[in-house]
Amino acid sequence: MTHYTTLLFDLDGTISESAPGILRSVRYGLDAVGIHETDEKKLRTFIGPPLNTQMKKLYGMKDDDIVTAITKFRELYEEKGALFDCSPYAGIGELLSLAKAAGYVLAVSSSKPEPFVKRIIENFGFTSYFDVICGSDPNDELNQNATMSQKARIIAKTLSLLREKGHDTARLAKEAVMIGDTGYDVDGAHDNHLPCIAVSFGYGSREELAAHGADAIADTVGKLRELLGLETGHE
C-alpha cells in the first residue's frame, strides 16, 4: 500500500459521532417549512452531504424553502448549541496523536460550515493536531449552481491551503489521502485525483463505499490505524 504522509479527514462520521445534534437540527429546519419527518434512516442521510442537496433530493424543495429550512437549522445548531451534541469516536484522538507524532501532515476537510468545524475540533481538544482546518463557506449550502461538488471544492481548497503553508505540491499529489465515511467523500477525493480510505463506522454503509470505489475500507478505528501504518493499540 502507498505510504501516505498527508491525511485529510472528514469530520462528521469520521472524527465525530455527530448524529444527535444534526438530526435534532434537521427536524427543526424541516418543521419550519411544513415537513414533519419521522423516518430516522432518511434523516441520517443529511449527515455528510450539503443540506440543500439532500433537501432537494428527498423532498423536491423550492429554493426559498431550502433557505428557510437551513436558516432554522442553523438557529438550533449554532445559536442554541446543538453542534456540541457530539463526541469523538473512541480511539480517534489517539490515532490523531500518533499520526502527528509520526510526522504526518493532518488536515480537516469537511463540508460543514468552517466556523462550526473549528469550534467542534477545538471543543474536542484536537486543534493542535491539524495544519489546516477547512470547511465550507457558511453561505455555500445556498449555492444551487456550482458545477463541482461541494466536497470536491473543499478538498481542492484544503490542498491549496497546504501548499500555501509550504507543503510540496508533488508530494501532496502522490502521498495525500482522504479519509471519510460516505460515497460523497470518495467521489470528492477522486475528483481531486486522490485515493480515499473510507470508514464504515460512520454514516455510509460498506456497500455504498464499495460502490463508489473506495480504495480501502476500515470497519474500525483500529483497522484505520493499520491501513495508515500506525502502531496498533486499544480502540
Summary of predicted features, one role per range:
Residues M1-T45, Y59:
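Active-site neighborhood of HAD-like aspartate-dependent phosphohydrolases
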Residues H3, E79-V108, E114-I121:
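Short, acidic loop-to-helix structural element flanking the phosphoryl-transfer center
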Residues G29-L30, P50-D63, I120, I154-L162:
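Helix-loop "lid/cap" segments that line or gate small-molecule binding pockets
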Residues E114-V177, G183-D191, R206:
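Substrate-recognition "cap/lid" segment bordering the active-site pocket of phosphatases
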Residues M178-A218:
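Acidic, Mg2+-coordinating phosphoryl-transfer loop and its flanking beta/alpha structural elements
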